[in-house]
Amino acid sequence: MANLNADGKLKQICDALRLDTLKPAEDEAAALLHNAKEQAKRIIQEAQEEARKILETAEERAHQKIKQGEVALSQAGKRALEALKQAVENKIFRESLVEWLEHVTTDPEVSTKLIQALVQALEAQGVSGNLTAYIGKHVSPRAVNELLGKAVTTKLRKKSVVVGSFVGGVQLKVEEKNWVLDLSSSALLEIFTRYLQKDFREMIFQGS
């Protein structure tokens, strides 16, 4: 019986020691575990947030690069289109116009009509003096003189037209004033280009 009482007291002492020492340690360990879990949770959340920010920044930079690339491609496309338009204008419009003008303005009848128009314009403005009429280098002076007749050739300095250095068309010079009225093929080309090129571009490249 005495041993039983002794065993009971020993158990009581052990239980008391457990409550006094082990229980606080267990509680402390539980608290540490809880804190560790909370800290790990915060670290994971912070890492996820940082990863999200890094991803957003990377996506934004990628979009900027794509946008810059699109702008560069657009500008390059516009430059290429403009270069193509210029090439088409030079090939179709200007070259065709040059060919047509040279064909038309080397006709003696056209040269005659241009000289007559210029002489009449000067007379209408009351301008008089020695006149020299130049024609294109591929035009026959004899043919133009015959078409002009003496009514006009007598007003010319040499009583005849003079062959110029240009292809077609005419130039009329007022010697005393050193005026040159230029309707040569090259001058007519510039006039036609200035007034017709815009219409040509709109007609050919409408909607482009």
Curated annotation (Swiss-Prot):
Keywords: ATP synthesis, Hydrogen ion transport, Ion transport, Transport. The keyword Ion transport applies. InterPro entries: ATPase_V1_Esu. One of its GO terms (biological process) is proton motive force-driven plasma membrane ATP synthesis. Transmembrane segments: none annotated. GO terms for cellular component: proton-transporting two-sector ATPase complex, catalytic domain. It comes from the Bacteria. GO terms for molecular function: ATP binding; proton-transporting ATP synthase activity, rotational mechanism; proton-transporting ATPase activity, rotational mechanism. Produces ATP from ADP in the presence of a proton gradient across the membrane. Belongs to the V-ATPase E subunit family. This is V-type ATP synthase subunit E. The gene is atpE.
